[in-house]
């Protein structure tokens, strides 16, 4: 059973300078996506990024952090239960993103929670909060929500702990992407409450179309933003994510 969540959050709550809350937008680093969501994510919000394996969730998260550090002056943290820091760096180099440089400059911190999770979820989250404080982060990618869920004995326990965590991130005005795995063959998230957990929901979907892989992005939920029912084709290029300019009408979506 996970305990001590309240104490962890309260002891770290005053560690961050607070910013004036407002409806200003945080660029994702994907211009075509930002156009769909009125300029970007609402600052301080938490967005769930859900998708099957291989749909580019990690790439989207890294692009979000690199763009923030390089173009927006916003430091970030990538906290992963699944990937090691070295693997993330290797993947990032494919897109020309040098995470080593950003780490040395104090603009990015990679946190591997693979071993920390063995000491308990509270310890792992304390590690994340310490990293956020160290680099004065304004952006966080947590990978993954699905892996975190397995550490709890019940959905109710997980729900309670995550609400505490999200309240802390909101108070710190940290804009967060939480990655969630969708198993192959399923159209819903891992648990019944994940899609209601965040302020926004981005769904990445992969399917086969005429013997080729077709990737689509949907944005069924985004707080303070006009909802779009269309799906958009997207590609993972040498420079990262890119959306096709023409939407897929709802009546054409299978």
Locate each region found by the language model.
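Pre-Walker A adenine-sensing motif
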Residues: 28-40
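Conserved P-loop
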Residues: 46-48, 52-117
């Amino acid at each position: 059973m996970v305990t001590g969540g309240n104490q962890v959050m309260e002891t770290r709550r005053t560690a961050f300078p607070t910013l004036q809350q407002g409806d200003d937008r945080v660029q994702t680093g994907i211009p075509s996506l930002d156009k769909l969501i009125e300029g970007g994510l609402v600052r301080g919000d938490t967005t769930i990024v859900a998708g099957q394996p291989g749909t580019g969730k990690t790439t989207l998260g890294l692009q979000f952090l690199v763009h923030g550090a390089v173009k927006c002056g916003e430091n970030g943290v990538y906290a992963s239960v699944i990937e090691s820091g070295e693997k993330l760096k290797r993947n990032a180099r494919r897109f020309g993103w040098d995470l080593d440089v950003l780490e040395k400059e104090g603009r990015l911190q990679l946190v591997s929670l693979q071993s920390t999770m063995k000491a308990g979820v509270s310890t792992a989250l304390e590690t994340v909060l310490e990293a956020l404080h160290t680099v004065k982060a304004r952006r966080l990618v947590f990978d993954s929500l699905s892996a975190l869920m397995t550490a709890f004995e019940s959905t109710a326990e997980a729900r309670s702990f995550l609400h505490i965590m999200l309240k802390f991130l909101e108070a710190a005005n940290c804009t967060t992407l939480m990655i969630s795995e969708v198993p192959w063959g399923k159209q819903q998230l891992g648990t019944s409450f994940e899609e209601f957990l965040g302020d926004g929901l981005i769904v990445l979907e992969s399917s086969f179309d005429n013997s080729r892989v077709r990737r689509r992005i949907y944005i069924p939920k985004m707080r303070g933003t006009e909802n779009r029912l269309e799906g958009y084709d997207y590609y993972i290029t040498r420079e990262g994510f890119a959306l096709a300019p023409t939407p897929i009408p709802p009546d054409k979506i299978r």
